Amino acid sequence: MGLTSSLRFHRQNNKTFLGIFMILVLSCIPGRTNLCSNHSVSTPKELPSSNPSDIRSSLVSLDLEGYISFDDVHNVAKDFGNRYQLPPLAILHPRSVFDISSMMKHIVHLGSTSNLTVAARGHGHSLQGQALAHQGVVIKMESLRSPDIRIYKGKQPYVDVSGGEIWINILRETLKYGLSPKSWTDYLHLTVGGTLSNAGISGQAFKHGPQINNVYQLEIVTGKGEVVTCSEKRNSELFFSVLGGLGQFGIITRARISLEPAPHMVKWIRVLYSDFSAFSRDQEYLISKEKTFDYVEGFVIINRTDLLNNWRSSFSPNDSTQASRFKSDGKTLYCLEVVKYFNPEEASSMDQETGKLLSELNYIPSTLFSSEVPYIEFLDRVHIAERKLRAKGLWEVPHPWLNLLIPKSSIYQFATEVFNNILTSNNNGPILIYPVNQSKWKKHTSLITPNEDIFYLVAFLPSAVPNSSGKNDLEYLLKQNQRVMNFCAAANLNVKQYLPHYETQKEWKSHFGKRWETFAQRKQAYDPLAILAPGQRIFQKTTGKLSPIQLAKSKATGSPQRYHYASILPKPRTV
């Protein structure tokens, strides 16, 4: 596909030409629909030069309900990965969907005269600069929290929320009605738009699919500035493109999320295995059953001293004497973590159900620990750990995380090499591992997964300790990640990255496989100038190649278009 580079747009002062230009621009950018404002989109009479001060002036001239700032850009120049420093030119604080649409249409109108790109930023929890827009515009999506969270009861209850709302607020509000979303991430202080642009996977995904599986409707601002309402039956291509689409096709401004009755309590259970085959077999057994736990995850523990004694602060052992005799030093262990939801009046039957399920498993008997906690406390468990790390100054540090999706057929070979040879400890962060059943997932989203019904999420979640050396050093952890990836490639394990990050077109094409052409075609349809989500490093904005008038001409003549891919993007500057 490609953008023809032979045509170049030259600015002219002739008023007649400007009139024709405006007609063509407006004809190739459909008008907005379902906006939360009655304002019309203001368009500059002249295109500003590429000079940053002229670009700033053009942004200031926009008629917005919110506002644009230029002074605090360093606050959004980093993300949770904390490895890159890429300040934008400006920050948009939108008060309405109209503000986002106006900004997008303005940048489309500028065409090849500017380098402006746009990144929608929620809580900034991307890992490798995906939510950054170097010298572009960052949209602070948390400013877009109006109208309020709206909950609808009935046979199929749902909640309407802003794309900038965070999941913990949705949980708190829906619980007032005895309801809750079905599928979660492990950390709830993330925005709706952020998780739906990736997938949103946690221990409920085997039963309900990821969060993108539980969306009825979306409102999207596309890369052209169009505001589109979409669902499985209405504008379905855009709907499925955006879900798991890495922010490439549009900005999620509203979402309608499926709900279910919420429990009051959970029984939270942990058990240990020393044999990976037994561990993975039991995990797969649990996710295959109709009547099973409501949450199934697991994690790897390598050479951890006094492990079970550390659990006692939150969990109670089934057999305290036997638990005290268990030694974890020097061992590679696998923890199965499961949860059963219940209400107080169901406690007795819940105990019977969990007892029966546990009796069918092959864990080490002395390692059974459990706890009963409120539903919201369990779901918000990572935030409790966050507060402790913040107090120690260990939250805002580099996070060289690696998230992989591994086919069932490859998981044993992966575990044998990685957990026994490549890794010697995991004291600097957890390693999650659990299977999901893909047969219950929607098939048409942009999310890329292995081509097997059952695959495992394996997440390496280390933190690089500041001013450290050895195994806690950032460079060491990055090299360790690369060793894992090199092994996967050499062994041909057919692994896919979750929250992917690649540097070259070849790598992105390999990631998408046979779906690459569809992905690129949808990019052309919804964001033809490649304005959105530059930090993903998939496409580069077509600066100096095509303006809207040339784009319209190329469509009219059927001229081929060419995108510029990640292979020619400049390397981000490290912090």
UniProtKB/Swiss-Prot annotation:
GO terms for molecular function: cytokinin dehydrogenase activity; FAD binding. PANTHER family: CYTOKININ DEHYDROGENASE 1, GULONOLACTONE OXIDASE. It is found in: Vacuole. Residues 1-31 form the signal peptide. It comes from Arabidopsis thaliana (Mouse-ear cress). Glycans are attached at residues 14, 38, 115, 303, 318, 437, 467. Its cofactor is FAD. This is Cytokinin dehydrogenase 1. It is an enzyme of class 1 (oxidoreductase). The modification Pros-8alpha-FAD histidine is found at residue 125. Belongs to the oxygen-dependent FAD-linked oxidoreductase family. One of its GO terms (cellular component) is vacuole. It catalyses: N(6)-dimethylallyladenine + A + H2O = 3-methyl-2-butenal + adenine + AH2. Its main location: other. FAD binds at residues 120, 122, 124, 126, 130, 186, 191, 197, 201, 252, 498, 536. Transmembrane segments: none annotated. Its EC number is 1.5.99.12. Induction: Down-regulated by jasmonate. Residues 84-262 form the FAD-binding PCMH-type domain. Catalyzes the oxidation of cytokinins, a family of N(6)-substituted adenine derivatives that are plant hormones, where the substituent is an isopentenyl group. Catalyzes in vitro the oxidation of various types of cytokinin nucleotides that are known as direct products of cytokinin biosynthesis. Promotes adventitious root initiation downstream of MYC2-dependent jasmonate signaling. Cytokinin degraded by CKX1 is required for cell division in the female gametophyte by modulating the expression of cell cycle genes.
